[in-house]
């Protein structure tokens, strides 16, 4: 076997439809679009969700909920990320300095994900119960 003798398995590569290439191809002239009508035209077709003039589903259903603006400026910090902070003191500014959270973040919460091995001091961040227990078990402390 050589590289120049390799070929794909029989039937695995299906040729694409060649539209408008004569009557004998079966896809000549109208190219499978039929005669006249909106869908036969170039650029023809209806927009997504259009139901022929009937009141569409997205307008029949009621509006609900909202997008919290606070969610965009809030971040979750994993326990395993705390080890990346130099100096052992973790607060909002040190997290931003080490690129663990973005500069636009104003609130952060430490969650129980991963492990913390070195003792760290968490200052001014919210901490879940499980994360609090893990930090204290590793010899760290939480300052409000």
Swiss-Prot record:
Cellular compartments per GO CC: cytosolic large ribosomal subunit
Taxonomic superkingdom: Bacteria
GO biological process: one example: translation
Region (Disordered), start-end ranges: 1-54
Ranges of Gly residues composition bias in the record: 21-31
Keywords noted in UniProt: Ribonucleoprotein, Ribosomal protein, RNA-binding, rRNA-binding
GO molecular function annotations of the record: rRNA binding; structural constituent of ribosome
Function: Binds to the 23S rRNA.
Protein family membership: Belongs to the universal ribosomal protein uL15 family.
Assembly mode: Part of the 50S ribosomal subunit.
Protein name: Large ribosomal subunit protein uL15
Species this protein is from: Salmonella arizonae (strain ATCC BAA-731 / CDC346-86 / RSK2980)
Organism lineage: Bacteria, Pseudomonadati, Pseudomonadota, Gammaproteobacteria, Enterobacterales
Gene transcribed to yield this protein: rplO
């Amino acid at each position: 076997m050589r590289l120049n003798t390799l070929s794909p398995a029989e039937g695995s590569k299906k040729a694409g439809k060649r539209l408008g290439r004569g009557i004998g191809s079966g896809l000549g002239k109208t190219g499978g679009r039929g005669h006249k009508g909106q869908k036969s035209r170039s650029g023809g077709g209806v927009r997504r969700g259009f139901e022929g003039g009937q009141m569409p589903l997205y307008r029949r259903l009621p509006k609900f909920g909202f997008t919290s603006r606070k969610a965009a400026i809030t971040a979750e910090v994993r326990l395993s990320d705390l080890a990346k902070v130099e100096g052992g003191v973790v607060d909002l500014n040190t997290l931003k300095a080490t690129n663990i959270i973005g500069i636009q973040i104003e609130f952060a919460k430490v969650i129980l994900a991963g492990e913390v091995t070195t003792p760290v001091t968490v200052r001014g961040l919210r901490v879940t119960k499980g994360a609090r227990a893990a930090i204290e078990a590793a010899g760290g402390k939480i300052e409000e």
